[in-house]
Amino acid sequence: MPRPIRRLTLPLALFAVAAGTVFAADRTLAAGPWGGDTVIFEVVADGAHVEFECARGRIDKAITLDGKGDFDLPGTFGAEGRGPARDGDGAAANARYRGHVEGDTMALEVTVGDRRMGPFTLTRDRRPFLKKCR
């Protein structure tokens, strides 16, 4: 085997293994948790469940990254408050979830109406303890 090809074999093999842990087929994020200081982004086959300290959200489409590692998907977002829940509390609003994935790190931003939250820095397979507002 020529020397330049031999030098690339190990790095390419390592990249293939690492990419397989983050992506399923077609750059769709593989199922599993991504966690930050105040958020857990749980990727599931058909989207994601998002849990914040005082809110919850949902994305109902598989998270497929573009060629730059970005996604921009619609979802829902609902605030949670302290104390007992009342009728109408936590009603889900339309939201926009934008993210960028590079290796095992995700930058996430959530927009609800004119309110922008983030960016949050998340790490694959991290599941932090959230201090809930309940």
Annotated model-derived regions:
Residues 26-40, 108, 129-134:
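Tryptophan-anchored aromatic micro-motifs
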Residues 37-79:
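N-terminal glycine/threonine-rich, aromatic-flanked beta-hairpin/loop signature
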Residues 28, 35, 44, 57, ...:
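Residues that act as N-cap/strand-start positions at coil-to-secondary-structure junctions
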Residues 1-12:
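Bacterial N-terminal signal peptides that target proteins for export
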Residues 73-100:
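An anionic, turn-rich surface loop/hairpin at beta-sheet edges
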Residues 28, 43-46, 102-106:
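A short, compositionally biased
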Residues 20-26:
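Sec/Tat signal peptide C-region and signal peptidase I cleavage site
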Residues 57-69, 105-134:
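Edge beta-strand at a domain terminus
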